[in-house]
């Protein structure tokens, strides 16, 4: 294992780190609205660090670019995921809402996603022409014509429908240029282990959110964990997605990218889905 290969100097920047509570999540605009709609409420332990060395910043960017290039080169990808959305109640109690699911991608224009949590059982399919979102337990669905690529779909969901795909930024054709231009601070934090996989641990800061990513070391540098923490709303809300059972190419099971709507399901508009959203209505902020 390479846990000892990282320079001990990288840890000098965090040896005096103090735990602090950041201001937590707000609904963000533009590129981060995708995540804001997923992350909506709170809790995260923020970490204050000393400035990283330039060499560490360059190394972090190189590792992130290698992951971005690797992801872009994969025509077929599938993985399972576990996600946790932290919320804060009006009484200040912090609660985590856990979900699990699957994601199957066929570039440039197909996605099949499932997600099951305590409040929702959702299936989502995009075939390059139409996007269908089915709430199985609520027996409702949305179907919209959205022709184009995965990149165009993510933008459309973000800007028009405010409906995110898990790890949406990581599905884009150029992850590096989705995130890096917004980063005001970049760090290589050394090694970490996620589900037995040794990873490079990177941290980025933008004007509105803090990002952490753990990237598998070796010839398949896929994202093992992705964490988003807000700086702007009291309570430091955090959204975490853990990736497992990563497969590419011929390992990926065949998928029709077709989602038949069951008889009796009610058609809704994209703005009328409180029962199948990741954040259930009982936790929605009061107006």
Regions found by a protein language model. Name each.
Residues 7-39:
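Bacterial N-terminal signal peptides that target proteins for export
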Residues 37-48:
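Bacterial N-terminal signal peptides
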Residues 49-55:
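Sec/Tat signal peptide C-region and signal peptidase I cleavage site
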Residues 55-63, 72, 91, 134-199, ...:
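Flexible, processing/modification-adjacent segments and terminal tails
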Residues 57-58, 82-84, 132-133, 142, ...:
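Gly/Pro-enriched, hydrophobic low-complexity segments
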Residues 58-140, 221:
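N-terminal mature ectodomain segment of secretory-pathway/periplasmic proteins
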Residues 90, 122-126, 135, 143-146, ...:
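A short, polar/proline- and glycine-enriched secondary-structure boundary/capping micro-motif
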């Amino acid at each position: 294992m390479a846990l000892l290969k990282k320079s001990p100097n990288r840890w000098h920047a965090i040896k005096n780190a103090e735990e602090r509570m950041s201001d937590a999540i707000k609904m963000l605009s533009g590129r981060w609205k995708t995540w804001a709609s997923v992350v909506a409420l709170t809790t995260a332990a923020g970490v204050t660090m000393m400035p990283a060395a330039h060499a560490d910043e360059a190394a972090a960017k190189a590792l992130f670019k290698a992951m971005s290039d690797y992801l872009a080169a994969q025509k077929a990808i599938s993985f399972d995921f576990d996600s946790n959305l932290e919320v804060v109640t009006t009484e200040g109690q912090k609660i985590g809402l856990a979900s699990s699911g699957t994601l199957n991608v066929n570039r440039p224009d197909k996605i099949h996603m499932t997600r099951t949590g305590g409040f929702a059982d959702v299936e989502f399919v995009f075939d390059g022409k139409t996007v269908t979102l089915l709430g199985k337990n609520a027996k409702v669905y949305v179907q919209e014509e959205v022709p184009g690529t995965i990149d165009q779909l993510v933008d459309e969901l973000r800007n028009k429908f405010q409906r995110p795909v898990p790890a949406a930024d990581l599905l884009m054709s150029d992850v590096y240029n989705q995130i890096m231009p917004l980063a005001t601070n970049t760090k290589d934090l050394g090694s970490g282990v996620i589900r037995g996989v040794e990873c490079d641990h990177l941290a980025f800061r933008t004007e509105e959110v803090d990002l952490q990513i753990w990237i598998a070391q070796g010839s398949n540098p896929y994202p093992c964990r992705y964490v988003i923490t807000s700086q702007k709303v009291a309570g430091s809300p955090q959204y975490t997605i853990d990736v497992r059972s990563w497969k590419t190419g011929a390992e990926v099971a065949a998928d029709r990218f077709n989602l038949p709507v069951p008889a009796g399901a009610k058609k809704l508009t994209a703005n009328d889905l409180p029962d199948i959203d990741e954040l259930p209505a009982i936790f929605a902020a009061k107006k």
